[in-house]
Each structure stands twice: as C-alpha cells, then as structure tokens.
Swiss-Prot record:
Domain of life where this protein originates: Eukaryota
EC numbers, comma separated: 1.1.1.330
Protein name as catalogued: Very-long-chain 3-oxoacyl-CoA reductase
Function: Component of the microsomal membrane bound fatty acid elongation system, which produces the 26-carbon very long-chain fatty acids (VLCFA) from palmitate. Catalyzes the reduction of the 3-ketoacyl-CoA intermediate that is formed in each cycle of fatty acid elongation. VLCFAs serve as precursors for ceramide and sphingolipids.
A GO term from the CC aspect: endoplasmic reticulum membrane
Pathway linked to the protein: Lipid metabolism; fatty acid biosynthesis
Disulfide bonds: none
GO molecular function, one term: ketoreductase activity
Record flagged with keyword NADP: yes
Length: 331
C-alpha cells in the first residue's frame, strides 16, 4: 500500500486530476446510459399509432398465421386498423380473418397466401394489386425462418441456408418495396421489422440466421433515414427468446414473454430508444436490460461473448439430436 501511495505521489498532480476527470466522465456516461434505458422502458410511452393513420386505415402483416404475426394482426385489429394478412397457408389466413372480423365489428380483412420461400415475383405483383387503392398505414415485416436446430455452418443443408436468406432478407425487402411507396405518397406510415438478438450479437451454430438478421439491422436503419423526410417511421424491433414455434420455447417467464405480452410492449414503445443504434428498440424490459448489460460489460462482439454463445448453442444442438434419436427409437 505504501509503495502504491509513493508511486501515485510521483505522478504530477495535473495528471492525477486528468485521470480522475476521465474516470468520472466514464462513470457518469454509464449511469446516464442506464437512466436513459430505465426512462424509456418504464416511464416514457411510445408514438401513438394514430400518427400513422385513422381507424379504418390498413395494416399489412407478414407471417400472419401464427405466433407474433397473428398477435400483431389481432392487436392492430383491436385498435381499429383493417388488416391485410400475408402468409403461406391460405386456410389459416381465412380462419384468422373470420376470427378477427367476428371480434371487431366493422373490421375489414384481406388475405394473400404467399410462400416467401419460392421468391415468386408474381406473388409480389399480387400483393401490389391487393393493396391498390388502400390507405396503408402500417407494415409489420414479421415473416422469418431460422435453422431447425443449431448447426455448424459447414453442415448447414444448402436448401436451409437458401431459404433463410430468401425469406428473411429478400422477402422483407421486396415486400417493403411494394408497401413503402404507398406510405411515402400519403406522407405518413410505420414500418416495423422484426430483428433478433441473433443478429445483434454474432451467433455461432446459427451463422446464416445471425447474418440474415444482422443484414436487416443495417438495411432497416439505412431505410429509416432515407424515408424520414417522407413522414414514414421505420424501426427494427429487437428481441431475445419469445414463446413460439420458432424458438421452441413453450413456457413463458420474465425472460421469455408470450407473443401477446411482447406485441403489446412493441406497439406501446414505438420509437423509445432503448439502445444505441438509431431507429432500433428493444421493447421487452428484461431483454433490454440484458442487452444493456452485455454491451457495457463483455461487449457484443467479444471473444468471451462468442465462446459463451458457442457453448450454449452446442448444448442446445446436443439435446435436440438426443431427443430426435429417442423419438426415432419409439417410432
């Protein structure tokens, strides 16, 4: 201790004051960052949906037949928006349309059975024709695909790799190219694209999915700045795990919300800046706190983070393969 005191005493006082000032600024920045997070998560409300269109205007929801997409459609319908449902299975879409119309009085719906995996230009033409003349206020880019189980990139089936990129990237871009001009013409609109922690943080054993979601992050942020002057708000919505068929998680918890709870927070926190990337928000409180902690401790691209992610997804893969083996023996 005496040697440390002696060493510090030999440092010029002006340097000591400079170091103390830098330390104080660093700590203050972290405290302010956390307070900003808490303010946006628990106190401030998001942009009211009425900014984008009055009741009776239209919302387009992709991947609408199940999970988050179905919940976005349900909650937007309850808020007075007519709904265009886009997904692969026509029977599910028609069933959901009837359900929404029964619950919401004068609600109107339109459906388009569209397999994004096929990347068929005729489907996008049909979407454009379906939307012709409609007052489209909102687009929810929810359609997406992940790996069936975590898998090393070198073992990823080529068809799975292609489908992930085609659906997550091309499908989202082409849909937005159909819908966004309608919004730009009417000088207002909202585009929400579902991101993922898998794209925010590099994720070994989900490399293709991770890359596709990282692509959407940069695309969405760039598009947001392009369309800002047109009155169209564009946001990427980040999440960790949600109870869904894609996540294969069935039991909700503080860290894993139900689709209903997550969508309620997503629609209630539009534009609340819960992280450092512009036009991006993480609406679910525990996800946002975990994100802040990772960014301010180990870092999103650090070797430690990559190693933890790798081990976690290796373990998930091992359990999934063992389960498949047990089920095969029972058959």
């Amino acid at each position: 201790m005496d040697s440390l005191t002696t060493a510090l005493g030999s440092v010029p006082q002006v340097v000591q004051w400079a170091l103390a000032g830098v330390g104080a600024l660093y700590i203050s920045a972290k405290v302010l960052s956390y307070l900003h997070l808490v303010l946006n998560l628990f106190i401030l409300g998001g942009t009211n949906l009425s900014k984008y269109g009055k009741k009776g205007s239209w919302a387009v929801v992709t991947g609408a037949s199940d999970g988050l997409g179905k919940e976005f459609a349900s909650q937007l319908a309850a808020k007075g928006f007519n709904i265009v449902l886009v997904s692969r299975t026509e029977s599910k879409l028609k069933e959901l349309a009837k359900e929404l119309e029964a619950k919401n009085g004068s609600l109107k719906t339109k459906v388009l059975a569209m397999d994004y995996e096929q990347d068929n230009d005729d489907d996008y033409e049909k979407l454009g024709q379906l939307l012709s003349g409609l007052d489209v206020a909102i687009l929810i880019n929810n359609v997406g695909r992940s790996h069936s189980i975590p898998v090393p990139f070198l073992q990823t089936p080529r068809e799975e790799l292609q489908n992930i990129v085609t659906i997550n990237c091309l499908g989202t871009l082409k849909t937005t190219q159909v819908v966004a001009p309608i919004m730009a013409q009417r000088k207002r609109g909202l585009i929400l694209t579902m991101g993922s922690f898998g794209g925010w943080m590099p994720t070994p054993f989900l490399a293709t999915y991770s890359g596709s979601k990282a692509f959407l992050q940069h695309w969405s942020t760039s598009l947001a700045e392009e369309l800002r002057s047109s009155g169209v708000d564009v946001h990427l919505v980040l999440s960790y795990l949600i109870v869904s068929a894609m996540s294969k998680v069935r039991r909700p918890s503080a860290m894993v919300p139900t689709p209903r709870a997550f969508v309620r927070s997503a629609l209630g926190k539009i534009g609340c800046a819960t992280q450092n990337v512009a036009y991006t928000y993480t609406p679910w409180w525990s996800h946002a706190i975990m994100q802040w902690w990772v960014e301010n401790t180990i870092g999103i691209g650090s070797k430690i983070g990559l190693q933890v992610n790798l081990k976690m997804h290796k373990d998930i893969r091992t359990r999934a393969l063992k389960k498949a083996e047990r089920e095969a023996k029972k058959a």
